[in-house]
Amino acid sequence: EIIASVYDKMEQTGLEHGILFIDEINCVSETLAPTMLQFLQCKTFGNQAVPAGWVIVAAGNPPEYNKSVRDFDLVTLDRVRRIDIEPNLAVWQEYARAHRLHPAVQAYLELRPQHFYRIQNDVDGPQFVTARGWEDLSAMLTACTKLDLPVDEALIGQYLRHPEVAR
């Protein structure tokens, strides 16, 4: 199915090169690990090959963010290149401007840049604020503005899951 979608995309667009993106690669079940190793090693699923000119790119979250994460064995690690990505407010602000995120979100982060990205665990469980939360909040604020609906701390707290930031 995955390989077929690549061939479908090539047929639809006429493109001969592309990126096959696989998300949450480190959440693959133990039973699928050999298949994933074959995929990374040979660029095949079963007898179906990824077309020449296509690159495989995968992403996964660290174990502290996702309880389903499995560590790769040495054989698999030897076939991938790891690039750690850190939150970067300046880069995200460029994205926010380009995608016209709600001005209140942009203004808030200009005043309180330390609130951009936070992840903490305490007795009440995880408290977090991520780039995705800011973008989702922006969409909700835009909808509330258009529909003339009130915005309060409870609503904001659904997107910014850290009490200090949601206030």
Question: How would you name each of these model-derived features?
Answer:
Residues 166-167:
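C-terminal engagement/docking regions of AAA+ P-loop ATPases
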Residues 1-111:
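AAA+ P-loop NTPase catalytic core and its hallmark functional loops
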Residues 93-160:
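Conserved AAA+ ATPase small/helical "lid" subdomain
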